[in-house]
């Protein structure tokens, strides 16, 4: 055959359930997560294990980044290339029996993620299978910065399945790209000071202060006077090696070695040294363990930035994944960023995630996938 087909969605929803027994007992959470069951919980019946937990929404019907991607790719209104000189593009109606006449076209002009102009117009008649050139008379885009044009085709009135204003098709055009950001000047600011009292070193600079214990690691860290670490950081503050990650939901099943939760690290030592002109302080952590040894080298720069170089050496046969674990001050609960969002996206799943400025709680960055991506 000369034809091929791909990108099909096997399942709309993760096929996991809450059992009757758990509902009756009120046993709906495990370690803070929803307790769902899959085929593995019913060995007496034919099943496919966890395989059918591959939907684009979660078992409790919450959207995921996969849903945003599918919606953008499947949408039945196609946007042609933007003619930046004429400020026009072509709309093609892929619906079988719907005319686009009366649909609302809403647009926003963004510069570096911020809305600088917006407008709305009503679409003319565009019959099924037909195309129409559409013009948007947005303003000046000659300033420095990255200009983007967001376009959405929206319902003018509520329907039985969506409210008025619901977007049935979207796109984002890049009108211009911003120039490269200036490289950070790590030597900005006054030289750092390094002092020692007992087993604790103190690093001080204009924008940073840090305490490092030679047996515990980093126990205090402030940026601009704000604590980066939790208050009880005396016990575990430094980033540490973590391999607590396995295919089926990090489940600690019995004594199976693949589900051990420890990292196998038996010793950690820390050394601290300033360079000759106090423009940087280096913190070196060496650790040994049954699964791997590692060496972390932190470079604290006078401008307040911290670079971390991590090197791992495998020592055992059951090393599954290499990662790092660090806890932050819980008061640092909000983020603002200029990138793709607002749902999770990856380099090969980003068409449904537009560039913009997003203000989100840290909790929004956690997605309860039934099965971790592997």
What are these regions (language model features)?
Residues 91-97, 314:
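Asparagine-centered strand-capping/turn motif at beta-strand->loop junctions
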Residues 153-162:
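Short acidic/polar inter-strand loop motif in beta-rich domains
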Residues 104, 146-150, 307:
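Short, conserved beta-strand segments of beta-strand-rich sandwich/propeller modules, principally
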Residues 137-144, 159, 174-374:
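Beta-strand/loop-rich accessory regions of lumenal/periplasmic or secreted enzymes
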Residues 110-144:
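Intrinsically disordered, low-complexity Pro/Gly/Ser/Thr-rich segments with frequent PxxP/GP/PP motifs
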Residues 7, 70, 91, 151, ...:
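Conserved, mostly hydrophobic/aromatic
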Residues 1-86, 95-101, 106-115:
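Extended substrate-binding grooves/exosites of carbohydrate-active enzymes
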């Amino acid at each position: 055959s000369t034809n091929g087909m791909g990108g099909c969605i096997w399942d709309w929803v993760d096929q996991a359930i809450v059992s009757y027994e758990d509902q009756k007992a009120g046993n709906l959470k495990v370690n803070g997560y929803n307790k769902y069951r899959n085929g593995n919980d019913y060995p007496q019946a034919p099943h496919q294990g966890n395989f059918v937990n591959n939907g684009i929404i979660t078992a409790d019907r919450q959207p995921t980044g996969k849903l945003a991607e599918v919606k953008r790719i499947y949408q039945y209104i196609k946007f042609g290339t933007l003619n930046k000189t004429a400020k026009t593009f072509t709309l093609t109606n892929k619906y079988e029996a719907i005319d686009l006449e009366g649909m609302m076209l809403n647009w926003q002009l963004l510069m570096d993620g911020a809305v600088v102009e917006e407008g709305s117009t009503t679409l003319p008649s565009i019959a099924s299978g037909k195309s129409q050139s559409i013009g948007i008379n947005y303003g000046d885009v000659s300033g420095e910065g990255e200009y983007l044009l967001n376009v959405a085709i929206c319902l003018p009135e509520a329907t039985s399945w969506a409210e008025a204003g619901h977007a049935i098709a979207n796109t984002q055009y890049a009108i211009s790209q911003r120039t490269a950001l200036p490289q950070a000047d790590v030597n900005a600011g006054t030289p750092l000071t390094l002092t020692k009292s007992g087993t604790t070193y103190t690093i001080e600079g204009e924008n940073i202060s840090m305490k490092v214990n030679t047996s515990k690691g980093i126990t205090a860290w402030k940026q601009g006077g704000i604590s980066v670490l939790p208050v009880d950081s005396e016990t575990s503050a430094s980033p540490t090696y973590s391999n607590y990650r396995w295919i089926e939901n990090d489940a600690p099943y019995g004594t199976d070695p693949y589900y051990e939760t420890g990292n196998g690290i038996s010793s950690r030592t820390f050394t601290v040294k300033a360079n000759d002109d106090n423009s940087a302080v280096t913190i070196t952590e060496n650790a040994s363990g049954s699964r791997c040894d590692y060496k972390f080298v932190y470079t604290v720069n006078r401008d307040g930035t911290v670079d971390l170089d991590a090197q791992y050496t495998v020592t055992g046969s059951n090393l599954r994944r290499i990662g790092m674990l660090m806890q932050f001050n819980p008061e640092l609960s909000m983020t603002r960023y200029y990138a793709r969002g607002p749902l999770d996206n990856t380099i090969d799943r980003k068409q449904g995630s537009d560039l913009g400025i997003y203000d989100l709680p840290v909790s929004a960055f956690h997605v309860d996938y039934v099965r971790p991506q592997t």
